[in-house]
Regions:
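Short mixed-charge
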Residues: 139-152
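Polar, glycine-rich mid-to-C-terminal structural blocks
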Residues: 170-183, 192-193
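Class I S-adenosyl-L-methionine
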Residues: 1-82, 104
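Conserved S-adenosyl-L-methionine
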Residues: 64-141
């Protein structure tokens, strides 16, 4: 302590009621103090976006270099941070995150939220369309500038739209008790990809979970990181149930892990109870612990 006092590293107050504090210099810290104001000409950002998307597609965009600078300041201690922007606009934040990851090797992720606000632009119906297209083109641009000596960064993204549930709401009033409609509890016109996303959300599975897709009997078979399999095919007979069970077992055994494996199927996908029971028995015999249906 005496040495710190002699070096001027202890700041004392005007009297004994003020607690002494340790003096630390900026070059001794792992983070930087954020400047209250810094200036950049926003016309440069407009020119870069015009070159990327076409002239005048999105006027007065935020500067991706400025946003990257702010993100760097708050994520430098954790380059794997998740960045959220509820007003995506032209997609500047996502572009900034990809640029920053390319510059420092970070693995930051981003979530962008944008209303489908209509726009009158050639080739674009909504602002969200512009957002997605900018991310696609920025991804290609960044990849083209990467050195062959550096590991490629992940610039991919997934796009989701807010929609009603794939599962029909239950209404027990007499005028709604249509037995023919009740046979299938899933909304019409939905794809197996739609079912997969809702299943992931309901089960708490991250949407960024690695996904592989195969095919069995003409319907997709989904593999989520080897711990969750999903098959939403229809008209599943006993023979087809055995075929699906064999495909699931073979795929799981390609890279067996210690985690428990769950299988999710479409409840109304089986032609009868015998096919469903046969499928469950085949999975149990193969060592699958959990079978769920939607």
């Amino acid at each position: 302590m005496t040495e710190l006092v002699s070096e001027g590293r202890i700041r004392f107050g005007p009297n004994e009621t003020i607690r002494p504090t340790f003096k630390r210099y900026l070059d001794e810290t792992s983070t930087q103090t954020v400047l209250p104001v810094f200036y950049t000409d926003r016309r440069a950002a407009s020119k870069r976006l015009d070159a990327l998307l076409g002239k005048g597609v999105f006027p007065y965009p935020k500067d991706e270099n400025v946003i990257a600078r702010w993100i760097d300041l708050v994520t430098r201690s954790n380059p794997n941070s998740l960045v959220l922007d509820f007003f995506a606009g032209s997609g500047t934040t996502g572009h900034s995150v990809m640029n920053l990851n390319a510059a420092d090797g970070g693995k930051r992720r981003y979530i962008l939220v944008q209303l489908d606000e209509a726009v009158d632009k050639d080739g674009y119906d909504t602002i969200a369309d512009i957002t997605r297209e900018r991310l696609r083109r920025a991804s290609k641009q960044i990849a083209s500038k990467q050195s062959l000596d550096t590991a490629p960064i992940d610039t991919g993204f997934r796009s989701y739209r807010l929609a009603t549930s794939n599962i029909k709401p239950w209404d027990g009033t007499p005028d709604q008790l249509d037995l023919l409609e009740a046979v299938d509890n899933l909304a019409a016109g939905r794809t197996t990809d739609d079912l997969l996303v809702e299943m992931m959300l309901r089960m708490g599975v991250e949407l960024t979970t690695p996904l592989e897709t195969g095919e069995v009997a003409g319907s997709p078979l989904y593999n989520l990181a080897g711990t969750l399999f999903a098959y939403f095919g229809t008209n599943i007979t006993i023979d087809r149930a055995n075929e699906v069970a064999k495909a699931l077992t073979a795929w799981r055994d390609e890279d067996p892990g210690d985690a428990e494996t769950t299988v999710v199927v479409r409840d109304t996908g089986f032609v009868d109870s015998a096919a469903k029971l046969n499928f469950a028995a085949a999975l149990k015999q193969a060592g699958f612990i959990t079978l769920r249906s939607i």
